Every structure is written in structure tokens, then in C-alpha cells.
A protein has these predicted regions:
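Nucleic-acid endo/exonuclease domains
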Residues: 1-109
Length: 109
């Protein structure tokens, strides 16, 4: 894991009320973090994700994962370093929204 992945895991996701797994194999990919309940994948992106080849690979990967009804959150590494609280709030909001969409009646599953 990168230092950004370690920080997000140990300082936020590891003890998050909704279970997240790290380095989870999903089909032909290994994702950084995955919540089956929220149907969310979190990918932390370093600089290699922003060149032409990286963008193309990420686009293909995201499309593949979205075919299974998963939402992919792509977060630049520098945001984890510079705005950790904002990253956590963003994830929190996306998880809440996803849980509401996956359980519109509000009943516990």
C-alpha cells in the first residue's frame, strides 16, 4: 500500500461503521478499497493515472466495475495529503447516498 492508502485505511476506513476491504480482487482487477454493502470502490490515484495511457486504463477499469453496479470513487493522492478531512467527508457522503439508493425504503437489510 502507498502511504496515502495506509493513511486512509488506518485513520478512517479500518474502523468505519460500514465494512471496507483493502486490496480486494474484483474480476480481473485489484481495487484499493471496497465496500460490498455500499457498493463502492475507492481508488487512490498517483501521478501515473494522469497521463494518456493511465487515463485510458482507468476509464476501461471504471467501466468494467460499473457494469456490476459498483460506484468508483477516484481520489488523487495529493488530496489525501492536502485535504484529508475533505476526502473523508466526500467518502462519507457517497456512502450515505449509496446506502439510501440501495435501500430506498429505509428498512434494514
Amino acid at each position: 500500500m502507498t502511504k496515502e492508502e495506509r493513511r486512509l485505511w488506518y485513520d478512517f476506513l479500518r474502523d468505519y461503521p460500514i465494512k471496507f476491504s483493502r486490496q480486494k480482487v474484483l474480476g480481473k482487477y485489484i481495487v484499493d478499497f471496497y465496500s460490498a454493502k455500499a457498493k463502492i470502490i475507492i481508488e487512490l490515484d498517483g501521478s501515473q493515472h494522469y497521463d494518456k495511457e493511465g487515463i485510458a486504463k482507468d476509464s476501461e477499469r471504471t467501466a468494467y466495475l460499473e457494469e456490476y453496479g459498483l460506484k468508483v470513487l477516484r481520489i488523487p493522492n495529493n488530496q489525501v495529503n492536502q485535504n484529508f478531512r475533505g476526502v473523508c467527508e466526500y467518502i462519507e457522503n457517497e456512502v450515505k447516498q449509496s446506502l439510501c439508493m440501495n435501500n430506498p425504503s429505509g428498512k434494514n437489510q
